[in-house]
Amino acid sequence: MRKLVRMDFFFYGTLLDEDVRRLVLGPEAARLGLVPARLPGYRRVAKGYSSVPLLARRSGASVEGLLACGLDCRQAARLRHYEGRDYRLARCKVRLADGRACAAMVYLGQGRIPLPRGSWRLGEWQRRSKPAFLKLAALWLAAYRQAGYETRGRVRWVKRWAARD
């Protein structure tokens, strides 16, 4: 019998938006366990050339977000496609409201990080950029489905990550 792999992810940017989560993760997004959490040692900044955020290390700072509990391999693979090559997956410790720490997967900027344009705020992004962003994200994810990744199960990397300590 195959072992069902489930992973927890920390969302700090566009995935805080319910419509984006539903687009990326599918209808199952509504059933995700979402818990308020914060990631210490980072701050959320606006990426220099786009409307999406990234995390920059900063001692004493922390980023508020959501811990999404129990994503399956297919959802994790869709997340990987959504995040693209500008981000890398890392395991970090997040803090829950009651002070407990727990491990979560987080997408961090990869390679040389462009100069940040200041803080990134969800409400501002939703007012200014969300409608156009949703259209582009829908096209990006349609390309993922057309490539057959949904049915071929390109999720081995997820199982490798889940097995790491």
Regions found by a protein language model. Name each.
Residues 2-165:
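Glycine-aromatic micro-motifs
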